[in-house]
């Protein structure tokens, strides 16, 4: 008998995230929801852990800034609104560029507990708009 997979894939589309700079990312579309270990309400920034275990988390976060000038943004995962420091993903500082777009990606493995709330946060002191994002979460043990 094959073990049931527990997978969540949530997508942020243009218009989902209008707060600039420092913000948690809202996901309007649940592309895949398999099993009961994970849940997400479309439009929310909260990804709920319903079963303790080890999880693989991958994300893609697209940032864009209007106009020329320096451009930098970072991303980090939060568990229960606490920063998980070793998941901090630093983007390069781009100076005097006109095409101000950048995508950050990362994959981490975390031990999470039932009742934990996982969030993806964009981190920047600049006016970065997070047009698109994706988070893939799978319980692996």
Predicted regions, residues:
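Extracellular jelly-roll beta-sandwich "head" domains, especially the C-terminal globular C1q domain
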Residues: 1-141
């Amino acid at each position: 008998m094959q073990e049931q997979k527990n997978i969540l894939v949530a997508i942020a589309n243009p218009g989902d995230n209008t707060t600039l700079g420092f913000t948690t990312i809202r996901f309007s579309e649940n592309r895949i929801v398999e099993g009961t270990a994970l849940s997400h309400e479309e439009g929310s920034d909260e990804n709920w852990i319903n079963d303790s275990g080890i999880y693989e988390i991958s994300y893609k976060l697209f940032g864009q800034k209007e106009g020329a000038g320096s451009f930098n943004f970072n991303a980090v995962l939060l568990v229960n609104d606490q920063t998980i420091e070793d998941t901090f993903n630093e983007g390069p500082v781009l100076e005097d560029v006109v095409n101000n777009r950048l995508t950050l990606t990362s994959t981490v493995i975390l031990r999470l507990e039932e009742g934990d709330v996982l969030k993806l946060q964009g981190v920047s002191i600049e006016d970065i708009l997070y047009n698109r994002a994706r988070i893939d979460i799978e319980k692996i043990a």
